[in-house]
């Protein structure tokens, strides 16, 4: 997502050269940094009071307004500058998941930003996603109220719901249906002639029958993810000019700890009785939603027409608190101007 710059046009460049006239100023700056450092206070507010600051979220706009208030209190000239808009907004709440079985466990997962939450607490059985038309017809009746385990490994992005993704699905379905016919022939030959032909592998595409599974009543989709789990956002949807509040995703897109995914996948294959339960509070906001840069400046006394630009991006992915990316930039940047 577009990086948002916190641009601070500062006064004349501060140096630490050992010039006698500058000794007092340098000493004062060092003393403030050692004895009155406010960086952790800035980080505490940004990461714990506001948390993840996704573009299009209330948390981002609240954080931007707070930065304006802080800069004004330090005597800076500051303003909010409109940077752009997103078609819809997104606010993330808490999320929970459980495996309900004799070996039940709390599930470790995340969902990409700008994807759907659940409709309250939702519980259901699990099925493997179909790879061809025959498999889809076989499980169609079990999709209603089911959590679907999909193929592939999570890299942060959600299921591709775009028109280009649908075009890829059409081609892969055709190829897999041909592979299915060849495999059926191989099975027949193995049975009739005692041959030991191996089955041909099917091509994978996460959510290959996505629309069909949604229409059949699936509760949501679960994909295996390496740990730490990476969750980004629905970039294709946000860049689509046709995106609006009436054509948003309706089912959760869960990225589950690969070790737990493997356990659940094996339980499905073994046809063991169990259920999965999720409560995911992802909420959309009517758009378009504007987002802003925070621009603050201190006019230099000696070189008023020269600038030192100090910046960091205030936005952050919202599955965490944005302490590293980019709290470690915003905290020092903001405090630099207090010392100036």
Where are these regions (language model features)?
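Noncatalytic luminal/extracellular "stalk/propeptide" segments of secretory-pathway proteins
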Residues: 44, 48, 52-186
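Stable alpha-helical elements in mature extracytoplasmic
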Residues: 25, 39-42, 59-67, 135, ...
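Second-shell loop/turn segments in exported
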Residues: 27-33, 50-58, 126-129, 194-203, ...
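Bacterial Sec-dependent N-terminal signal peptides
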Residues: 1-22
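N-terminal hydrophobic or amphipathic helices/low-complexity stretches enriched
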Residues: 19-77, 233, 298-302
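Conserved small/polar residues in nucleotide/adenosyl-binding loops
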Residues: 336-340
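Soluble metallo-hydrolase cores and metallopeptidase-like ectodomains found primarily
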Residues: 23-25, 108, 114-138, 239-322, ...
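Loop-rich non-cytosolic ectodomains and luminal regions
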Residues: 185, 193, 201, 206, ...
